[in-house]
Amino acid sequence: MKKIWNRMVCAMLLCILVTAATISANAAGMIDTNRDVALTISYQYNATAISGAKFDIYKVADVDAYAQMKVTDHFAEYPIPSDHMSQDDWNDFATTLKSYVWQDSLKPDFSGQTDGTGNWKTTVKPGLYLVVGSRCDVNDMTYTASPFVVFLPGSNEEQNTWEYAVTASPKADGEKKPSTDTRISRKVLKIWEDGDKKTSRPKDITIHLMCDGNVYDTVKLNAENNWRHTWDNLDQNHEWLVSEDTVSGYTQNITQEGTTFTVKNTSTTKTTTPSKTKDTSLPRTGLLWWPALALMAGGLLCVVIGLVRRRGADGE
């Protein structure tokens, strides 16, 4: 009986140690929301530094000490699906955020340009930020930076700490300037994700084609034109983007592949089918469930103490 008792105690103590180790390994601690984050934009193309490139930074969401986000007032009116968003999801959503910025002429929180080494350094407070770069001409090349979203401070998963010095490297596309007046085309395609509930969709939606941040043309997409449109005879020496007027009951996501923009509207109507989607939201990783582990460890410890006291009482 004594051996069984000793094994039980050892097993419980082992559970406590494993649980405590798990807590230590997965909790990066609280974010110091008053501390500045040093952000460096490092802009290169094929290992060549791009100087004189202008970047604008927009704060999309504030963050608290527990890495919980709250969308800022500037972006609160837009249908932003902030729940269950991983870092890759946010980057896929960056073009949509850029379309909001262009359509409504939102002012950036920070602006600057890269130096001779292709770097721009600034300091910001913790939060979720959209970074938008402008087209940049250097010698006979034109460079375009893909917009991206960054959560600050950064997360060091190996050391389980928050990093308050972060370097971000935007994806750059480069092409030689055309020697003649080259004309291009742009296409927009609408996709509905609503369980094929066509009766719930609006009869048409409004799409704006924007040129360097200004509205160039406006069209209506509907079933008659198969929810698509093509613009021809556009000047290649400008940056083109589409935006969509908000559709009630739907979120929107704009992506670009080559010369085609895809505008996807996803229904926000809740269904009764249980969702099995895993929460991969970057700011929540390893931060919200550690209190439950601590309670588990405390509970196991209480059980061990209780059994020890009971055995002591029985032995008296």
Q: Can you name each region flagged by the protein language model?
A:
Residues K2-E316:
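Solvent-exposed loop/turn and edge beta-strand elements of beta-rich ligand-binding domains
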